[in-house]
Amino acid sequence: MAVKAKTFEYAVEVDRGGRMTIPGGAQIAPAEGWTPDHLLLAALVRCSIESFTFHARRLGHEVAAAGEAQGTVTKRETDGRYAFVGIDVRIDAQLTPRADDLTDLLAKAERDCFIGATLNLKPEYEWHVS
């Protein structure tokens, strides 16, 4: 018998003024200069941190983390469409207690970020964990 996978559903509303609302929840208005491209990079950083934190806590660690991302958009050679052709993500995190081997934890954090897994290109990660 096949096991049914968990399903996560999300919704957001964007009004004519650009304000984003979670139905029945909070509203945010991006500051001047924020584009959908910036929001995608921010979502990738947040998702990467959340994924890392989830797996670290399962192993008994407390986490404090911050991050940044840079992306390059240009015309792809494959189809002539403008798209992200490179994304670099840097995450700085502290684990308490410290971990001896981070290999599996970092692999799971990258693998289980839904935003990164959805992209057509694989982000390049740089992790700094102490």
Question: How should these model regions be labeled?
Answer:
Residues 1-45, 50-130:
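Extended beta-strand/beta-hairpin segments
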